[in-house]
Amino acid sequence: VNPSNFAYQLAFRPNNYEVGCVATDWEFSGPTTITMHLRQNVYWWNVAPVNGRKFTANDVVFYYDRLYGLGMGYTKPMSTNTAMYALASVTAVDNFTVAFSWPGVSQETITEDMFGPMGGNEEAPEAISAYTSPSSLIITNWHNLVGCGPYVITDWVDGTAMTLTKNTGYWGFDERYPKNQLPYISNMKILIIPQTATALAAVRAGKIDAIDALSLTQAQQMKATNPNMTQLTYPGGPDTIDPKNDVAPFTDQRVRQAMQMALDLPLIASSYYSGTAYPYPSTMTSVFMTGWTYPYSQWPASLKATYDYNPTGAKALLAAAGASTFSVTCVASNASPDLDLLQIIQSEYAAVGITINIQLMDAAALNTMLRAQKNTGIAFGTKLGFTFPPLMGFRHWQSITTLNWDDIHDASWDALYAQALAAPTLAQTQALVVQGNQYEAQQQWNISLPCPSIFAVCQPWFKGYNAQTFSISGTAGVLCMGFYCSRFWIDQNLKQSMGINS
C-alpha cells in the first residue's frame, strides 16, 4: 500500500488494497453474496496425507463448513471462532470459484470478516480426517499440520521457537519485483523470548534479525549502543482514562470534560514521549486510518475547547457539576509500560482537585474485572484510536458487550452501530464510521491521551521489512507471517562485510 494513500502499518487495510491472496479477485454477485475466483496454481505442501495436490474450491467449502457448522457433517460452529456466525452458506460454483452468502449484513461487515486474520487459515480435509476426532476437533501435533503457504513448519519447540523451511512449490511472486518468485529466505526461525532484555541482547549481538513492539526508552537505548541498526516506527494506540460512566460523578459529562481539560497532551507528547507521539486527542478509530476517522484538525473550535488543556476551565466545570474535589481509584495493569505516564496524570489531576489512587493489578485479573463491569472508578486502558477493522470499534461502547466496561447505555450509539452493520455500500459504511467517531468525540466517554509511536529495530542486512503489523510478532502469534516474511530477504554480502557469517 502506498503510505500516501493509506497507512499500511495498521492492522486494518481497506480490502481494495489487499494483494497476494489465494483468491485472484472477488465481487458482490448479490447484495450479501461474495463470489471469489481462486488461483489455479496453488498446491498444498508436498507432505502426507495431501502429497502436494492442487488447492480447489472444495477445500474452501470444507474449511468454512467445518468452522461454522454449515455442512460436511459439521453442525455447530467451532468454539474458537465467533466472528462469522451469520455466514449462511459456502458453495463451490466450479473447481476454482466459491460463493459465500450471508442472511443480510453490510458489505463492509462481510469484507472485514473475509479479509481479517481469521478469514483464511484453510486446513487440508485429508489432514483433518486423519488427525482429528469428535472429541479432539483440532490438530494438536505440529508434525501433522498441512498448508499451502510459502513456508513449511519443520520444527517446533513449545514456548521457545518455530523453524520454517521454504516451500519450493509456492505460487507467489513479489509485487514490488514481479519476476522474483517467493519466498526469498530459505530457512527462518521465529523465537519466543519472554524477557525483552534477553531478546535485545541477542539483537545487539547479531543473533536476531528483527524485533518490534519496543518502547521509546528501549529504542533510544538501542540507538545509543547500536547506531548502525535500522530503526522504524509504526502507529500505536493511545492510553486512555476510562471512567465508569454510570457511577457519580462520571455520569455528568462536565466532569469527564474537566478530566480531559486537566491534561496537557502536547506537553506529554513532547516531554514524556520526546516528540514521537501524536499530541492531540483520538476518537474511536486511529487518526492514521485515512477516510475512516475524525481527526482533531477537522474538529470545530467549540469541540476542541472541551479537550484542550485548560486547568482553570476544568476547575470551573468541576465546581458547576458539584465535584470541586473528589478522590477515585484508578485500576491499571502492573505490566503496563506507561506507569510513569500514569504518575504524570495523577499529578495533573491533583492540580485541579482530583485525587487519583492508583491500584495495580495482574493484567488477566484486571481484564476479567473490567469485562464483568465490576470497576467502580476509572481504569487506565486503551479505548480509543483503534487500528483494527473499524466496525469492531463500535462494540466497545455497545450496550450488550463485555467490551463496554465504561458501562455506556446510549440508544443513539446502538442505533448508529446497527445502521453501520446494515449499510448496503462501502461508502455508506465509511460515512457511518466517521459519524460514529464524531459522536464518540462529542460524548467524551473516555479521556484521551497522546497516541505514541511503537518502535521496531532490524539489522541493516534485513531487507523488505517496514514494521508492518503482525509481520514478525503479535500477541496472538505472527498472524501475517506467511505474507510478509516471504517478502523479506537477507543482504548476505552486507552481512558478511560486517563480520556476521551465520
What are the language-model segments listed below?
Residues Y17, V22-Y74, A99-G104, A199-A202, ...:
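Aromatic- and charge-enriched surface segment that lines or borders ligand/interaction sites
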Residues E27-P31, T35-Q40, G73-Y131, P150-V157:
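Surface-exposed binding/hinge segments that line
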Residues Q257, A269-Y272, A301-D308, T355-L366, ...:
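Extracytoplasmic/peripheral linker and loop segments enriched in polar/acidic and small residues
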Residues V1-G30, V146:
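N-terminal lobe/hinge region of extracytoplasmic solute-binding protein
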Residues S136-H143, G169-Q221, T355-N357:
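Ligand-site clamp/hinge motif
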Residues Y151-V152, T276-A320, N334-D340:
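Structural transition elements
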Residues S282-T293, A364-A422, Y465-T469, G474-A476, ...:
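Acidic-aromatic pocket-rim loops
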Residues V1, I110, M222, D246, ...:
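Periplasmic-binding protein-like
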